[in-house]
Protein backbone atom coordinates (compact mmCIF):
# COMPACT_ATOMS: atom_id res chain seq x y z
CA UNK A 1 0.00 0.00 0.00
CA UNK A 2 1.26 3.47 -0.85
CA UNK A 3 1.86 5.82 2.06
CA UNK A 4 0.89 9.15 0.57
CA UNK A 5 -1.15 11.10 3.10
CA UNK A 6 -0.68 12.78 6.48
CA UNK A 7 -3.82 13.44 8.51
CA UNK A 8 -3.67 16.60 10.65
CA UNK A 9 -6.23 16.76 13.47
CA UNK A 10 -6.95 20.27 14.74
CA UNK A 11 -7.44 20.85 18.47
CA UNK A 12 -8.00 24.59 18.01
CA UNK A 13 -4.42 25.69 17.45
CA UNK A 14 -3.53 28.88 15.62
CA UNK A 15 -0.95 27.07 13.46
CA UNK A 16 -3.20 24.28 12.12
CA UNK A 17 -3.05 25.34 8.47
CA UNK A 18 0.66 26.04 8.77
CA UNK A 19 1.32 22.42 9.72
CA UNK A 20 -0.53 21.24 6.60
CA UNK A 21 1.48 23.65 4.46
CA UNK A 22 4.78 22.49 5.96
CA UNK A 23 3.98 18.86 5.11
CA UNK A 24 2.91 19.74 1.57
CA UNK A 25 6.13 21.68 1.07
CA UNK A 26 7.88 18.30 1.42
CA UNK A 27 5.88 16.98 -1.55
CA UNK A 28 3.56 14.96 0.70
CA UNK A 29 -0.21 15.44 0.69
CA UNK A 30 -1.73 16.51 4.02
CA UNK A 31 -5.30 17.37 4.96
CA UNK A 32 -6.85 18.99 8.02
CA UNK A 33 -9.87 17.80 10.01
CA UNK A 34 -11.36 18.82 13.32
CA UNK A 35 -10.05 16.61 16.12
CA UNK A 36 -13.48 15.24 17.07
CA UNK A 37 -14.27 14.06 13.53
CA UNK A 38 -15.32 10.41 13.50
CA UNK A 39 -12.67 8.42 11.64
CA UNK A 40 -15.41 6.72 9.63
CA UNK A 41 -16.01 10.11 7.95
CA UNK A 42 -12.40 10.42 6.77
CA UNK A 43 -10.82 8.67 3.80
CA UNK A 44 -7.93 6.80 5.41
CA UNK A 45 -6.65 5.18 2.20
CA UNK A 46 -2.87 5.44 1.82
CA UNK A 47 -2.53 7.01 5.28
CA UNK A 48 1.11 7.38 6.35
CA UNK A 49 0.76 9.16 9.67
CA UNK A 50 -1.18 11.52 11.92
CA UNK A 51 -0.27 14.88 13.47
CA UNK A 52 -2.17 16.32 16.44
CA UNK A 53 -2.04 20.13 16.59
CA UNK A 54 -1.79 22.55 19.47
CA UNK A 55 -4.77 24.19 21.13
CA UNK A 56 -5.63 26.82 23.76
CA UNK A 57 -7.28 24.57 26.35
CA UNK A 58 -5.99 22.27 29.10
CA UNK A 59 -6.33 18.50 28.75
CA UNK A 60 -7.26 18.48 32.45
CA UNK A 61 -10.46 20.39 31.61
CA UNK A 62 -13.42 18.02 31.19
CA UNK A 63 -14.63 20.13 28.26
CA UNK A 64 -11.30 20.07 26.44
CA UNK A 65 -11.23 18.77 22.83
CA UNK A 66 -10.74 15.05 22.31
CA UNK A 67 -10.01 12.89 19.28
CA UNK A 68 -11.50 9.60 18.16
CA UNK A 69 -9.69 7.04 20.35
CA UNK A 70 -9.20 4.80 17.31
CA UNK A 71 -6.43 7.07 15.99
CA UNK A 72 -3.97 5.09 18.12
CA UNK A 73 -5.15 1.77 16.63
CA UNK A 74 -4.58 2.56 12.94
CA UNK A 75 -1.03 1.21 12.89
CA UNK A 76 0.50 4.50 11.69
CA UNK A 77 2.89 6.83 13.55
CA UNK A 78 1.39 9.75 15.48
CA UNK A 79 3.07 13.07 16.30
CA UNK A 80 1.60 15.40 18.92
CA UNK A 81 2.46 19.12 18.99
CA UNK A 82 1.94 21.30 22.11
CA UNK A 83 -1.62 20.40 23.21
CA UNK A 84 -1.24 17.26 21.08
CA UNK A 85 1.89 16.38 23.08
CA UNK A 86 0.03 16.73 26.37
CA UNK A 87 -3.00 14.90 24.97
CA UNK A 88 -0.97 11.82 23.99
CA UNK A 89 0.54 11.66 27.47
CA UNK A 90 -2.80 12.24 29.23
CA UNK A 91 -4.89 9.65 27.34
CA UNK A 92 -2.17 7.05 27.86
CA UNK A 93 -2.16 7.46 31.65
CA UNK A 94 0.35 10.24 32.22
CA UNK A 95 -0.30 13.46 34.14
CA UNK A 96 -0.30 17.14 33.13
CA UNK A 97 0.42 20.08 35.43
CA UNK A 98 0.03 23.87 35.24
CA UNK A 99 3.22 25.37 36.71
CA UNK A 100 3.54 28.94 37.97
CA UNK A 101 5.84 29.81 35.09
CA UNK A 102 4.49 29.56 31.54
CA UNK A 103 6.81 29.37 28.54
CA UNK A 104 6.36 31.72 25.58
CA UNK A 105 8.66 32.63 22.71
CA UNK A 106 12.13 31.46 21.79
CA UNK A 107 13.73 28.91 24.10
CA UNK A 108 16.89 26.78 24.11
CA UNK A 109 16.17 23.10 23.46
CA UNK A 110 18.41 20.16 24.34
CA UNK A 111 17.63 16.88 22.56
CA UNK A 112 18.49 13.21 22.86
CA UNK A 113 20.18 12.53 19.53
CA UNK A 114 19.31 8.83 19.82
CA UNK A 115 15.70 9.71 18.94
CA UNK A 116 14.75 9.26 15.27
CA UNK A 117 12.73 12.48 15.56
CA UNK A 118 15.93 14.45 16.13
CA UNK A 119 18.13 12.78 13.52
CA UNK A 120 20.73 15.24 12.15
CA UNK A 121 19.55 17.90 14.63
CA UNK A 122 22.20 19.58 16.84
CA UNK A 123 22.06 18.66 20.50
CA UNK A 124 21.15 22.27 21.30
CA UNK A 125 19.04 24.64 19.19
CA UNK A 126 16.40 27.38 19.39
CA UNK A 127 12.70 26.46 19.36
CA UNK A 128 9.39 28.31 19.80
CA UNK A 129 7.31 27.63 22.91
CA UNK A 130 3.73 28.77 23.54
CA UNK A 131 2.25 26.87 26.51
CA UNK A 132 1.04 27.01 30.10
CA UNK A 133 0.59 23.30 30.85
CA UNK A 134 3.34 20.70 30.67
CA UNK A 135 3.88 16.97 31.12
CA UNK A 136 4.51 16.03 34.75
CA UNK A 137 4.53 12.22 34.94
CA UNK A 138 5.24 10.29 31.74
CA UNK A 139 2.73 7.70 30.58
CA UNK A 140 3.91 4.09 30.80
CA UNK A 141 6.19 3.09 27.94
CA UNK A 142 7.26 6.66 27.10
CA UNK A 143 10.64 8.30 27.59
CA UNK A 144 11.66 11.97 27.49
CA UNK A 145 13.76 12.91 24.45
CA UNK A 146 14.20 16.68 24.85
CA UNK A 147 14.13 19.36 27.54
CA UNK A 148 14.35 23.11 28.14
CA UNK A 149 15.30 25.09 31.24
CA UNK A 150 11.68 25.12 32.42
CA UNK A 151 10.28 21.94 30.84
CA UNK A 152 11.81 18.56 31.59
CA UNK A 153 9.66 16.77 29.00
CA UNK A 154 9.87 19.02 25.94
CA UNK A 155 9.56 15.89 23.77
CA UNK A 156 8.79 12.23 24.36
CA UNK A 157 8.34 8.98 22.47
CA UNK A 158 7.07 5.43 22.67
CA UNK A 159 8.82 3.75 19.75
CA UNK A 160 7.04 0.42 20.28
CA UNK A 161 3.74 2.16 19.47
CA UNK A 162 5.23 4.76 17.06
CA UNK A 163 3.98 7.64 19.23
CA UNK A 164 6.02 10.85 19.28
CA UNK A 165 5.35 14.32 20.64
CA UNK A 166 6.91 17.73 21.21
CA UNK A 167 5.86 20.55 23.54
CA UNK A 168 7.23 23.21 21.17
CA UNK A 169 6.11 24.30 17.69
CA UNK A 170 8.35 22.89 14.92
CA UNK A 171 6.02 24.30 12.25
CA UNK A 172 6.90 27.98 12.90
CA UNK A 173 10.00 29.55 11.38
CA UNK A 174 11.25 30.60 14.83
CA UNK A 175 12.06 26.95 15.58
CA UNK A 176 15.56 26.70 14.14
CA UNK A 177 15.36 23.08 12.93
CA UNK A 178 11.58 22.76 13.00
CA UNK A 179 11.13 21.81 9.36
CA UNK A 180 13.84 19.15 9.67
CA UNK A 181 12.07 17.68 12.71
CA UNK A 182 8.82 17.50 10.74
CA UNK A 183 10.67 15.89 7.83
CA UNK A 184 12.16 13.32 10.18
CA UNK A 185 8.64 12.39 11.23
CA UNK A 186 6.89 12.53 7.85
CA UNK A 187 9.62 11.18 5.57
CA UNK A 188 11.71 9.20 8.04
CA UNK A 189 9.38 7.68 10.63
CA UNK A 190 6.17 7.58 8.53
CA UNK A 191 8.08 6.86 5.30
CA UNK A 192 5.55 8.96 3.38
CA UNK A 193 6.01 9.13 -0.38
CA UNK A 194 6.51 12.43 -2.20
CA UNK A 195 3.59 12.23 -4.61
CA UNK A 196 2.07 15.72 -4.15
CA UNK A 197 2.96 17.57 -7.37
CA UNK A 198 0.92 20.18 -9.23
CA UNK A 199 1.68 18.59 -12.60
CA UNK A 200 0.12 15.31 -11.52
CA UNK A 201 -2.72 17.05 -9.68
CA UNK A 202 -3.66 18.99 -12.83
CA UNK A 203 -3.84 15.83 -14.94
CA UNK A 204 -5.84 13.95 -12.32
CA UNK A 205 -8.42 16.67 -11.64
CA UNK A 206 -9.00 17.33 -15.36
CA UNK A 207 -9.47 13.60 -16.00
CA UNK A 208 -11.79 13.28 -12.99
CA UNK A 209 -14.02 16.17 -14.11
CA UNK A 210 -14.07 14.89 -17.68
CA UNK A 211 -15.16 11.42 -16.56
CA UNK A 212 -17.64 12.47 -13.88
CA UNK A 213 -19.36 15.32 -15.73
CA UNK A 214 -19.23 14.19 -19.33
CA UNK A 215 -21.90 16.01 -21.37
CA UNK A 216 -22.95 18.24 -18.46
CA UNK A 217 -23.19 22.03 -18.76
CA UNK A 218 -21.71 24.24 -16.07
CA UNK A 219 -21.67 27.92 -15.22
CA UNK A 220 -18.93 29.90 -13.47
CA UNK A 221 -18.90 33.43 -12.10
CA UNK A 222 -15.52 35.03 -12.81
CA UNK A 223 -14.16 37.81 -10.60
CA UNK A 224 -10.92 38.46 -12.46
CA UNK A 225 -8.99 36.96 -9.54
CA UNK A 226 -6.62 34.01 -9.63
CA UNK A 227 -8.89 31.48 -7.88
CA UNK A 228 -11.90 31.74 -10.18
CA UNK A 229 -9.64 32.07 -13.24
CA UNK A 230 -7.68 28.89 -12.48
CA UNK A 231 -10.86 26.99 -11.54
CA UNK A 232 -12.54 27.98 -14.81
CA UNK A 233 -9.45 27.06 -16.86
CA UNK A 234 -9.24 23.61 -15.25
CA UNK A 235 -12.92 22.89 -15.90
CA UNK A 236 -12.72 24.28 -19.43
CA UNK A 237 -9.87 21.90 -20.23
CA UNK A 238 -12.13 19.06 -19.11
CA UNK A 239 -15.49 19.98 -20.70
CA UNK A 240 -14.66 22.74 -23.20
CA UNK A 241 -17.51 25.02 -24.26
CA UNK A 242 -19.92 23.21 -21.97
CA UNK A 243 -18.60 25.67 -19.39
CA UNK A 244 -20.17 29.12 -19.67
CA UNK A 245 -18.45 31.85 -17.67
CA UNK A 246 -19.98 35.15 -16.61
CA UNK A 247 -17.91 38.22 -15.75
CA UNK A 248 -19.91 41.01 -14.12
CA UNK A 249 -18.56 44.56 -14.36
CA UNK A 250 -20.08 46.28 -11.33
CA UNK A 251 -18.38 49.60 -12.01
CA UNK A 252 -16.02 49.14 -9.08
CA UNK A 253 -13.06 47.58 -10.88
CA UNK A 254 -9.53 48.96 -11.17
CA UNK A 255 -8.37 51.00 -14.15
CA UNK A 256 -8.81 49.13 -17.47
CA UNK A 257 -9.44 45.93 -15.50
CA UNK A 258 -12.50 44.70 -17.38
CA UNK A 259 -10.76 45.05 -20.73
CA UNK A 260 -7.50 43.36 -19.67
CA UNK A 261 -9.27 40.54 -17.85
CA UNK A 262 -11.51 39.77 -20.83
CA UNK A 263 -8.51 39.71 -23.18
CA UNK A 264 -6.80 37.21 -20.88
CA UNK A 265 -9.90 35.02 -20.67
CA UNK A 266 -10.28 34.98 -24.44
CA UNK A 267 -6.60 34.04 -24.74
CA UNK A 268 -7.26 31.09 -22.45
CA UNK A 269 -10.05 29.92 -24.72
CA UNK A 270 -12.72 30.40 -22.06
CA UNK A 271 -16.33 30.80 -23.11
CA UNK A 272 -16.98 34.13 -21.34
CA UNK A 273 -19.82 36.61 -21.38
CA UNK A 274 -19.21 40.05 -19.87
CA UNK A 275 -22.20 41.83 -18.38
CA UNK A 276 -21.85 45.58 -17.77
CA UNK A 277 -24.06 46.47 -14.83
CA UNK A 278 -21.96 49.36 -13.53
CA UNK A 279 -24.78 51.94 -13.70
CA UNK A 280 -27.14 49.68 -11.74
CA UNK A 281 -24.61 49.09 -8.96
CA UNK A 282 -23.57 52.73 -8.67
CA UNK A 283 -27.21 53.88 -8.59
CA UNK A 284 -27.93 51.45 -5.75
CA UNK A 285 -24.87 52.65 -3.83
CA UNK A 286 -25.59 56.35 -4.23
CA UNK A 287 -25.43 58.19 -0.90
CA UNK A 288 -24.56 55.08 1.14
CA UNK A 289 -21.56 55.47 3.46
CA UNK A 290 -21.77 52.49 5.83
CA UNK A 291 -19.20 49.84 4.75
CA UNK A 292 -21.29 46.82 5.74
CA UNK A 293 -24.35 48.19 3.96
CA UNK A 294 -22.24 48.83 0.86
CA UNK A 295 -21.04 45.22 0.94
CA UNK A 296 -24.59 43.90 1.28
CA UNK A 297 -25.92 46.06 -1.55
CA UNK A 298 -23.17 44.84 -3.87
CA UNK A 299 -23.47 41.20 -2.79
CA UNK A 300 -27.26 41.09 -3.08
CA UNK A 301 -27.35 42.74 -6.50
CA UNK A 302 -24.56 40.51 -7.76
CA UNK A 303 -26.71 37.52 -6.89
CA UNK A 304 -29.66 39.04 -8.75
CA UNK A 305 -27.53 39.72 -11.84
CA UNK A 306 -25.96 36.26 -11.76
CA UNK A 307 -29.32 34.51 -11.39
CA UNK A 308 -30.72 36.55 -14.27
CA UNK A 309 -27.81 35.67 -16.56
CA UNK A 310 -27.81 32.01 -15.51
CA UNK A 311 -31.47 31.72 -16.51
CA UNK A 312 -30.68 33.17 -19.95
CA UNK A 313 -28.05 30.48 -20.53
CA UNK A 314 -30.26 27.60 -19.43
CA UNK A 315 -29.37 23.93 -19.15
CA UNK A 316 -26.48 24.42 -16.72
CA UNK A 317 -26.71 21.81 -13.98
CA UNK A 318 -23.55 22.63 -12.03
CA UNK A 319 -21.98 25.75 -10.57
CA UNK A 320 -18.17 26.06 -10.67
CA UNK A 321 -16.54 27.94 -7.79
CA UNK A 322 -12.95 28.89 -7.00
CA UNK A 323 -13.21 27.68 -3.39
CA UNK A 324 -9.75 27.03 -1.94
CA UNK A 325 -8.63 24.94 1.05
CA UNK A 326 -8.70 27.70 3.71
CA UNK A 327 -12.38 28.28 2.80
CA UNK A 328 -13.11 24.57 3.22
CA UNK A 329 -11.34 24.48 6.58
CA UNK A 330 -13.20 27.55 7.82
CA UNK A 331 -16.51 26.11 6.67
CA UNK A 332 -15.81 22.94 8.61
CA UNK A 333 -15.07 24.88 11.77
CA UNK A 334 -18.19 26.97 11.52
CA UNK A 335 -20.39 24.07 10.40
CA UNK A 336 -21.36 26.53 7.65
CA UNK A 337 -22.52 25.99 4.08
CA UNK A 338 -19.87 25.49 1.44
CA UNK A 339 -21.23 28.60 -0.30
CA UNK A 340 -19.99 31.52 1.76
CA UNK A 341 -20.33 35.27 1.49
CA UNK A 342 -16.63 35.85 0.83
CA UNK A 343 -16.47 33.58 -2.21
CA UNK A 344 -15.53 35.19 -5.49
CA UNK A 345 -19.01 34.80 -6.95
CA UNK A 346 -20.46 37.03 -4.29
CA UNK A 347 -22.18 34.48 -2.09
CA UNK A 348 -24.70 32.72 -4.28
CA UNK A 349 -27.83 31.41 -2.54
CA UNK A 350 -28.24 27.70 -1.85
CA UNK A 351 -31.65 27.59 -3.50
CA UNK A 352 -30.29 28.28 -6.99
CA UNK A 353 -31.38 25.57 -9.36
CA UNK A 354 -28.19 23.50 -9.64
CA UNK A 355 -27.52 19.82 -9.05
CA UNK A 356 -24.34 20.69 -7.22
CA UNK A 357 -21.05 22.54 -6.93
CA UNK A 358 -17.81 21.78 -8.75
CA UNK A 359 -14.81 23.04 -6.75
CA UNK A 360 -11.59 21.88 -8.45
CA UNK A 361 -9.33 23.91 -6.12
CA UNK A 362 -10.86 22.94 -2.80
CA UNK A 363 -7.74 20.99 -1.73
CA UNK A 364 -5.27 23.78 -2.50
CA UNK A 365 -3.75 26.72 -0.65
CA UNK A 366 -3.28 30.04 -2.47
CA UNK A 367 0.37 29.39 -3.34
CA UNK A 368 -0.60 25.98 -4.73
CA UNK A 369 -3.37 27.58 -6.81
CA UNK A 370 -0.75 29.87 -8.32
CA UNK A 371 1.55 26.92 -9.03
CA UNK A 372 -1.34 25.06 -10.66
CA UNK A 373 -2.22 28.12 -12.72
CA UNK A 374 1.32 28.31 -14.08
CA UNK A 375 1.22 24.56 -14.78
CA UNK A 376 -1.96 24.74 -16.90
CA UNK A 377 -0.92 27.81 -18.87
CA UNK A 378 -2.71 30.67 -17.12
CA UNK A 379 -0.64 33.80 -17.95
CA UNK A 380 1.93 34.77 -15.33
CA UNK A 381 0.40 38.22 -14.81
CA UNK A 382 -3.01 36.68 -14.13
CA UNK A 383 -1.58 34.11 -11.72
CA UNK A 384 0.15 36.86 -9.74
CA UNK A 385 -2.69 39.37 -9.85
CA UNK A 386 -3.28 41.24 -6.63
CA UNK A 387 -6.02 39.83 -4.39
CA UNK A 388 -9.06 42.02 -4.97
CA UNK A 389 -12.14 42.18 -2.71
CA UNK A 390 -15.55 41.26 -4.09
CA UNK A 391 -16.98 44.75 -3.36
CA UNK A 392 -14.07 46.18 -5.34
CA UNK A 393 -13.22 49.86 -4.98
CA UNK A 394 -16.41 50.43 -2.97
CA UNK A 395 -14.46 49.61 0.19
CA UNK A 396 -11.44 51.63 -0.91
CA UNK A 397 -13.52 54.79 -0.95
CA UNK A 398 -14.23 55.79 2.64
CA UNK A 399 -17.84 56.91 2.93
CA UNK A 400 -20.25 57.38 0.05
CA UNK A 401 -19.23 56.58 -3.51
CA UNK A 402 -19.07 59.02 -6.42
CA UNK A 403 -17.59 58.73 -9.89
CA UNK A 404 -14.95 61.33 -8.99
CA UNK A 405 -13.79 59.44 -5.90
CA UNK A 406 -13.58 56.23 -7.94
CA UNK A 407 -11.53 58.12 -10.55
CA UNK A 408 -9.01 59.18 -7.91
CA UNK A 409 -8.67 55.65 -6.51
CA UNK A 410 -8.32 54.15 -10.01
CA UNK A 411 -5.66 56.62 -11.11
CA UNK A 412 -3.59 56.46 -7.92
CA UNK A 413 -3.89 52.66 -7.79
CA UNK A 414 -2.66 52.41 -11.39
CA UNK A 415 0.38 54.55 -10.53
CA UNK A 416 1.08 52.40 -7.46
CA UNK A 417 0.90 49.16 -9.45
CA UNK A 418 3.09 50.56 -12.22
CA UNK A 419 5.83 51.78 -9.87
CA UNK A 420 5.82 48.69 -7.65
CA UNK A 421 6.38 46.63 -10.80
CA UNK A 422 9.12 49.01 -11.98
CA UNK A 423 10.92 48.45 -8.68
CA UNK A 424 10.63 44.66 -9.09
CA UNK A 425 8.46 44.24 -5.99
CA UNK A 426 5.17 43.14 -7.55
CA UNK A 427 5.68 39.47 -6.64
CA UNK A 428 7.28 40.16 -3.27
CA UNK A 429 4.42 42.16 -1.76
CA UNK A 430 1.24 40.25 -0.91
CA UNK A 431 -1.15 43.11 -1.62
CA UNK A 432 -0.94 46.83 -2.35
CA UNK A 433 -3.56 49.47 -3.15
CA UNK A 434 -4.70 53.04 -2.50
CA UNK A 435 -7.59 54.37 -0.42
CA UNK A 436 -9.54 57.61 -0.92
CA UNK A 437 -10.10 59.35 2.41
CA UNK A 438 -12.53 62.17 3.24
CA UNK A 439 -9.70 64.13 4.90
CA UNK A 440 -8.64 67.34 3.14
CA UNK A 441 -5.38 69.18 3.77
CA UNK A 442 -3.91 72.51 2.74
CA UNK A 443 -1.14 72.55 0.16
CA UNK A 444 0.55 74.74 -2.44
CA UNK A 445 0.34 73.96 -6.14
CA UNK A 446 2.07 76.48 -8.35
CA UNK A 447 1.59 79.83 -6.66
CA UNK A 448 -1.87 79.01 -5.36
CA UNK A 449 -3.25 77.50 -2.20
CA UNK A 450 -4.76 74.03 -2.67
CA UNK A 451 -7.18 72.11 -0.48
CA UNK A 452 -7.38 68.51 -1.68
CA UNK A 453 -7.94 65.00 -0.34
CA UNK A 454 -5.52 62.66 1.38
CA UNK A 455 -4.91 59.32 -0.34
CA UNK A 456 -3.52 56.44 1.71
CA UNK A 457 -1.15 53.82 0.30
CA UNK A 458 -1.43 50.33 1.79
CA UNK A 459 1.14 47.58 1.06
CA UNK A 460 1.47 44.42 3.12
CA UNK A 461 3.49 41.21 3.26
CA UNK A 462 1.95 37.87 4.20
CA UNK A 463 1.75 34.20 3.25
CA UNK A 464 -1.91 33.54 3.98
CA UNK A 465 -3.59 36.91 4.77
CA UNK A 466 -4.34 35.70 8.31
CA UNK A 467 -1.57 37.91 9.68
CA UNK A 468 0.18 40.71 7.77
CA UNK A 469 2.93 43.25 8.24
CA UNK A 470 3.29 46.58 6.46
CA UNK A 471 5.73 46.19 3.58
CA UNK A 472 9.03 48.03 4.02
CA UNK A 473 8.87 50.03 0.79
CA UNK A 474 12.05 51.78 -0.37
CA UNK A 475 12.01 55.49 0.43
CA UNK A 476 12.81 56.26 -3.21
CA UNK A 477 9.65 54.40 -4.26
CA UNK A 478 7.50 56.24 -1.72
CA UNK A 479 8.87 59.59 -2.89
CA UNK A 480 8.08 58.73 -6.48
CA UNK A 481 4.55 57.61 -5.60
CA UNK A 482 3.88 60.86 -3.74
CA UNK A 483 5.23 63.04 -6.53
CA UNK A 484 3.36 61.25 -9.30
CA UNK A 485 0.02 60.90 -7.50
CA UNK A 486 -0.10 64.55 -6.41
CA UNK A 487 1.07 65.90 -9.77
CA UNK A 488 -0.83 63.56 -12.08
CA UNK A 489 -4.15 62.97 -10.31
CA UNK A 490 -6.47 65.93 -9.89
CA UNK A 491 -7.95 66.20 -6.40
CA UNK A 492 -5.02 64.61 -4.53
CA UNK A 493 -3.18 66.86 -2.07
CA UNK A 494 -1.27 64.53 0.23
CA UNK A 495 -0.11 60.89 0.38
CA UNK A 496 0.20 58.89 3.62
CA UNK A 497 1.50 55.34 4.14
CA UNK A 498 -0.43 52.90 6.35
CA UNK A 499 1.97 50.91 8.57
CA UNK A 500 -0.69 49.04 10.59
CA UNK A 501 -0.21 45.29 10.95
CA UNK A 502 -2.94 42.64 11.15
CA UNK A 503 -3.91 42.19 13.91
CA UNK A 504 -4.95 44.69 15.21
CA UNK A 505 -5.89 46.18 11.85
CA UNK A 506 -7.24 44.47 8.74
CA UNK A 507 -5.82 44.58 5.22
CA UNK A 508 -8.68 46.66 3.81
CA UNK A 509 -9.83 49.90 5.41
CA UNK A 510 -13.52 48.99 5.23
Can you describe what each PLM-predicted range is?
Residues 321-323:
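Extended catalytic-interface subdomain
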Residues 1-52, 56-62, 66-74, 86, ...:
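RNA-binding accessory domains that recognize and position tRNA/RNA substrates
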Residues 78-84:
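Conserved helicase ATPase motor motifs in RecA-like P-loop NTPase domains
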